[in-house]
Amino acid sequence: VKKRAAFGNPKTARSYASSVYGDCLDIITIQTMPKGRKTVITTVDHKRPDVYQKLLEQVKLGHQAYIVCPFIEDSESERFKDVLSVKTVVDEVQQFLHDNAPMYKADSISGDMKQKDVLAVIDQFARNEIQILVSTTIVEVGVNVPNATAIAVMNADRFGLAALHQLRGRVGRKGDQGSCCLVSDTSNEKLAAMTMFPSGFKIAEVDLQLRGPGDILGSEQTGDSKVVDMILRYPKLAAAIRNYFQTKE
């Protein structure tokens, strides 16, 4: 009998494999951090100038930093008047550096830029020609700059837990202590969970509790489900049902 081992990180890939192979698939979970990696210290902050100062302190130590914003440009809608954009924040940071540390540079990338221009800025950041990179969530995956040790997420309450956890995974990737500032005018269970739990598994559990699983067969991605609720509340019952059908085969 041939045996195969597949390694994957994204939850979608694991879910797909479970759907295709069902009980024929053994899932082994690695719950330890990569060798040399430290838990990213996560805090909630309310004042942007204080956050910029914290990032500058990391830059002065020879490291680099990210700032992530929800919007590319400021919205004209009254509803989103307090939501920060890449264009606003990069202007603020550049002025902050000009006033406090003109030898350092900040720049930005966003989804409305041409791919070659985005890659050019990322390449400069990777070479430490840019010390602070302001962006949308396009840095969430696929960007690996080991020298980056700090990240600030503006209007963090507007992001999902999965996105926040992925974003803080951008820093501290070569063993240096990483830090993540969640900048928000409000405090809620979601942000509290980020400060309390470094584990993606625990973050996923909290996310499930806060949002609900939604439809198993359907399009709703949030809301209560009696079936999933029963499985979560009574794991021994779920295991007994699974064993029953396995023995019948």
List PLM regions with ranges.
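Structural beta-sheet core signal
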Residues: 4-6, 67, 180-182
